[in-house]
Amino acid sequence: MYVKAEKFAQGGRSIGHLDDGRIVFIDGLFPDEEGEISIVDEKKDYCIATALSVALSSPQRRKSPCPFSSQCGGCLWIELDYDAQIQAKEALIEELFSDFPEITFEEPVTGPEFGYRSRARFQYTIRNGKASLGFCAESSNRNVEIKCCPVVDERLNDLIKNPPRLNAWELKDRELSCITTDEGVLYDDRTGWITVNDRRLPVSNKVFFQSNLILLPKLIDYVVSLTEGPKVMDLYSGVGTFSAFLEDRFDVTAVEINKACLSLARSHLKRTEFFTSPVEKWNPRTRQVNTVIVDPPRVGLDRKVPEMIASWKPDRIIYVSCFAPTMHRDIKRLKELGYEPQSLKVFDFYAQTPHVETCVLLVREREEDIDTVSIKVDLEGINIRQNKQLLPEKPTYEKIKVYVKEKYGFEVTSLYIAQVKDHMGLEKRANYNIGEGKAKVPNCPPEKAEAIVDAFRHFGMI
């Protein structure tokens, strides 16, 4: 089957159209390229395909610098010229946030496209008495043994060439998590230290820490430059990456649910006040705050958090995210609550992939700037039940599935949609959460829940 790729979709695949008009999401073709494809998943309204050959190649295509990229699948855009990667990421972000015309898109921050990752999770195997490291093949649990990886730190490549001999009890599910520190490479539970902007920060394989230590200082500097005091709240604070550079200038309160993160934060922060709590359940003693910084996981803010932050009436909110779709969802809600997104800056933390780190500044609208209009609606004589055209059409589960597939490139089930509806208190079908014999069924993965919530907003359900 021969297809032309038209543009990138959110998530990094290319979009094309089949002869019957259906959308096809393609791995292995870049925009304006043509080639033979193989359908790997077929639905009523769309398909997923992989390229078998490239007949008409883009001038932005290059030979892969990694001999394992075709098997590993971890670097979806490694055959795309780096300048073209940046342009594509900018275009995708601007498309996603196009419903905020007031946003200023600042110049993206870029860095080295190779050798930037300071941490990795390898698959560990022993064959013929010799240890080796690798990564999972794309959409598979199959291990791809590698001899090098162009995107990781040189010290991690040294580890790939000479992997340690470990006992089974030292591994978790045959995975080896590694992070480079000032002291060397850590692949156990010890604490190490990383120097960022002349300040030492604690890290370990048990907690999250940014993987791009080359661009992290620039992100920190940018966040600090946007912060106004005297009172600052650092929500989802982790090990205190931002608080470390704010506590000497502002009165900082940090909130983090992970006790291991807060333990590390307390080891180096002396002036910050800490709270161990889910952000959505935290009840601050004082609601006086000038700047709120949020750096949530991919799932974004809990649905209660935007209203909670808005009730404190901070002058500004700084939102940092590694997953722009959920950030967009949350900013849409924050705007409804009186916070206008002013600027957006992309940091290319993840070269060779479609992913970026994004920072948005939101500023509270002053009451005198808000125009109010009084509207009187005469409902006398109108029967809402008889005039269903007055109500928005209720989206079907199938429409939600198609929306998610077209925007995010993956599928969601009716079960997952029902679970998210249940979580949000929306009307749903019969209880999908209980299987035969009252057995519980799997919960919706966070990234799919994010996409479903976005679909709810798109269709006006929330």
Residue ranges and their predicted role:
Residues 29-35, 156-158, 166, 170:
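Short nucleic-acid-contacting surface segments enriched for D/E, G, S/T with interspersed K/R
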Residues 4-10, 14, 181-389, 397-398:
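Rossmann-like S-adenosyl-L-methionine
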Residues 52-64, 70-166:
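Extended interfacial segments that mediate partner engagement and assembly in macromolecular machines
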Residues 428-439:
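Short Lys/Arg-enriched helix C-cap and helix-to-coil transition segments
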Residues 1-68, 140:
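Terminal RNA-binding accessory module
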Residues 32, 152, 212:
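Short, conserved phosphate/pyrophosphate- and ester-handling motifs at nucleotide-, phospho-/glycolipid
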Residues 396-408, 418-424:
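DNA-recognition alpha helix
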